[in-house]
Amino acid sequence: MPDTRRSFLRTSALIAGTALAGARMTRSAAAAPLEIPPTAQQPGRPIPATGYGVPSKFENHVARRRTEVFVNRQNWSDWSMTPLQHQHGIVTPNGLIFERHHAGIPDIDPATHKLVIHGMVKQPLVFSMDDLLRYPSVSKFYFMECSGNTLADWTKAASTTVQQTHGLLSCAQWTGVPVSWLLDEAGVAPDARWVLFEGADGSNHTRSIPLNKVMDDVLLVYPQNGEMLRPEQGYPLRAFIPGWEGNVSVKWLRRIKVADQPWHFRSETARYTDPMPDGKWRQFSFVMECKSVITRPSGGMKLDRPGFHEIQGFAWSGRGRVTAVDVSVDGGKNWQPATLEEPVIDKCLARFRYRWNWDGRPAVIASRAVDSTGYVQPTVQDIMKSRAIAGFVQHHNGVFPWSVSAGGEVRNAIA
C-alpha cells in the first residue's frame, strides 16, 4: 500500500476516534439530570408595544462600528463597518450593512421625491416613487463592497478585527426596476455610450457608468432584504450596480442623464482611481475582483485548545461566481480545498468551510478564491507588480493572513 494511502487511513482513523470520543463526552453530559431553568417556571414578556423586532439583549455586541481612520473636526466618521465575524449566512441584516457617505444622510420624503431621465433620449421622463412602484420588479442577491475595503492593511497590520479589515462589505437581496426598462421607454439615442447617476445628498454624489453595463443588469432599488431601504442605504431610491465598487451604486437617486462620453467628476479623477507604477492613475476600475477572507477564527479571537476547529469565511467576485476556495494553515506554502456552502450565486457572497486539526503550534491561516472566469485571488506581492502601493490605495483584493499563536490568540498577519 502506498505511503500516502496508508497515511490517509491513519489520519482518518484518528479523526474518527476523536469524533467518537467527543460523542461519548456529549452523551455522558446529556445523561446528567437536566435542571429546570427559571425561564421555564414563569411566563415570559408580552409582545412589546413597538412594532419592529430587535435582536436579543445578549447580542448587543453585534453592531456596526464606525471607522476611526477618517474622522472630521466634528468627530464625525463617514464609514461604519459590517461585523463579518458575527455573520452566519450570506445575507447581511439591514441594520448591520456597512455605511459610506460623502455628505451625511439626507431625510427624503418619498411623497415628494422625483427621478428625472434626460439627455440623449427621445422622450425625457419624470417619475414619482408611486410611478416606479407600479412597474414590475425583480429581486436579486448581490454583494456590495466599497472600493476602500481593506485599504489600511496593504503592507502592515493597521487593523485588528475582520470587521476593521474587511467590514466595508455586505450582501443583500435587492429589489427594484431594471434601468434598461426605463431607458427603453425614454428611447436612447444610437450614439449614446454613458449614463450619469446623481444623488440628492449634500455632495450631489455623481458617477459616470458605461451604457452597456446599465442596460445589462443595473437596478433602481427601493427595497432591501424585503423592506424599504434604510435612510443610510439610500431611501427612498438608489441605483445598484452588481459586482462593481459600491460608490457607483448612487444613493438617494434623483437624476439619470444619457450622453456619449463620461463626465470625469471628482469621484472619477481625484478619487476612486488607482496609482500605477509609471506615475499615471487608472480611471474607471469599476469591477471588484475575486476576493476572500477567513472570518472565524480571525483577529481578536482566541482558540481555546488544540484540536479540530472549523475555519469559516466568505468569498466573492464582481466578475461572476466563486468556483473554488483554498485554505492554507502554513502561511501559503501549501493549500487545501475548502467546502463551498450552497447556494453559490453570481456576484454574491459565498460561504466556505475547512476543518482544521490545530496541533497547538503557531500557524498562519489564509484563504484564496477562484472565480468563474478562472481569475485567482492574488497576493499583495502579486498586486504590487502591476500597481503602485502608496498613499490612499483602493481595490485591495490580496490574500489576507491571520496568525495563530501557541496560546491561540489570532492576529492580523499582513506584512
Can you annotate each of these PLM segments?
Residues 12-13, 17, 31, 245:
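Enrichment for repetitive, rod-forming helical segments
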Residues 32-415:
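Structured, non-membrane catalytic/scaffold regions adjacent to prosthetic-group chemistry
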Residues 18-22:
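Hydrophobic h-region of N-terminal signal peptides that target proteins for export
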Residues 1-16:
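N-terminal secretory signal peptides and thylakoid transit peptides that target proteins
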Residues 24-33:
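Signal peptide processing junction and immediate N-terminal pro/mature segment
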